[in-house]
């Protein structure tokens, strides 16, 4: 099966291709869209079809591409690549930092000819507005709502099967609304596809990614991953004093599973601790900063004072929070069942 990467980081992509080769050896048709300079430095561990961005877009578009933010640039490139005919009708859409953590089979992405979408959020609830990623999610939400589509976020930081025809249809639909390219290719394709080509897509499934967000509790989960099948790779997590300190970033075939499990275990334990406002002394994180600093000690004292308050709130509000969570889940299941039933009606 074809897997298509965007990248401008040859070292990161080289390592990611090693992880993909080990855990997804069947994804052996590798296409990389990147600046020519990146392709020249790639030294890939697998056979790669490299497509220089400069050749895909032509000289007239280079200056415009350079002026775009990260999300707009990626959407522009993926749509242009789909139009070029360089990708298959159904391909795995990936980035250079999406790394498998365990053996993954093709059925993980396609079931009975239908693409499987892994959703991470309801965009009606996504209120962050700090990066081009956030703004692309908001624009996608507004466009999908206008077009009468669902509005789940499939920007789950893992590879997913993308239907080339549906991607181009969705891009055309938003292109009739605006000249902006600040959209999310995964989110548009899956929501638009489920509305207009439901026979090509399965029911949404929960995303299965570790390190999205980078640290647990950077924002509330809309749905928790039931397992960790992929890692959203952050190089700084492997620095001394950080969460994955001591674990190599490059894959060691003899220790791949052991290293993957060690990362999962550290991530899960940090999730449990941070949820109780307890942050390890020796691990850098967004709340305390680097370990051993004066600012970190002051922040630690602050969170220590908050822990009794949090425990009291949890006790007093336990029943209400449980009921709300159960109600929200039931409503979401009923709405999705109703929508699918309506689609199946003649």
Where in the sequence are the language-model features?
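PAPS-dependent sulfotransferase catalytic core
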Residues: 190-283, 288-289
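Boundary detector for helix-to-coil junctions that initiate low-complexity/charged tails
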Residues: 97, 283-346
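Conserved donor-nucleotide/metal-binding helix-loop-beta segment in metal-dependent transferases, i.e.
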Residues: 102-131
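N-proximal low-complexity "stem/linker" segments adjacent to membrane-targeting elements
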Residues: 1-11
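Active-site-proximal specificity loops/subdomain of glycosyltransferases
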Residues: 35-86
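Catalytic core and acceptor-binding pocket of nucleotide-sugar-dependent glycosyltransferases
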Residues: 135-230
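Short beta-strand-to-loop acidic/aromatic patch adjacent to the donor-nucleotide binding site
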Residues: 88-99
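Short, well-formed alpha-helical segments that are part of the catalytic scaffolds
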Residues: 10-23
């Amino acid at each position: 099966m074809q897997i298509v990467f965007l990248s401008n980081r040859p070292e990161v992509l080289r390592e990611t291709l090693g992880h993909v080769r080990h855990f997804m050896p069947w994804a052996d048709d590798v296409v990389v869209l990147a600046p020519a300079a990146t392709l020249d430095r790639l030294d890939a561990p697998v056979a790669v079809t490299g497509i220089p961005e400069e050749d895909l877009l032509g000289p007239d578009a280079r200056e415009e591409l350079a002026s775009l933010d990260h999300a707009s640039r990626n959407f522009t490139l993926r749509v242009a690549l789909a139009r070029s005919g360089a990708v298959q009708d159904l391909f795995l859409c990936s980035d250079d930092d999406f790394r498998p953590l365990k053996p993954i089979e093709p059925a993980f992405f396609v079931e009975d000819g239908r693409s499987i979408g892994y959703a991470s959020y309801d965009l009606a609830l996504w209120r962050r507005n700090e990066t081009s990623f956030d703004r692309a999610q908001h624009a996608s939400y507004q466009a999908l709502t206008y077009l009468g589509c669902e509005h789940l976020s499939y920007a789950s930081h893992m590879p997913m099967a993308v239907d080339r025809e549906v991607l181009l249809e969705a891009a055309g639909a938003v292109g009739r609304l605006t000249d902006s390219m600040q959209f999310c290719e995964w989110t548009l394709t899956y929501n638009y596809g489920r509305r207009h080509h439901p026979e090509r897509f399965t029911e949404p499934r929960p995303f299965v990614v570790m390190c999205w967000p980078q640290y647990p509790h950077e924002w509330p989960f809309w749905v928790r991953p039931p397992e960790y099948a992929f890692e959203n790779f952050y190089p700084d997590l492997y620095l001394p004093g950080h969460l994955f300190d001591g674990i190599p970033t490059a894959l060691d075939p003899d220790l791949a599973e052991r290293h993957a499990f060690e990362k999962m275990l550290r991530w899960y334990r940090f999730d449990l601790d941070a949820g109780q406002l307890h942050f390890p002394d020796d691990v850098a994180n967004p709340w305390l900063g680097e370990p051993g600093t004066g600012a970190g000690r002051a922040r630690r004292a602050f969170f220590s004072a908050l822990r009794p308050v949090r425990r009291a709130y949890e006790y007093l509000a336990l029943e209400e929070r449980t009921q709300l969570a159960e109600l929200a889940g039931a409503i979401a299941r009923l709405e999705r069942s109703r929508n699918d039933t309506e689609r199946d009606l003649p």
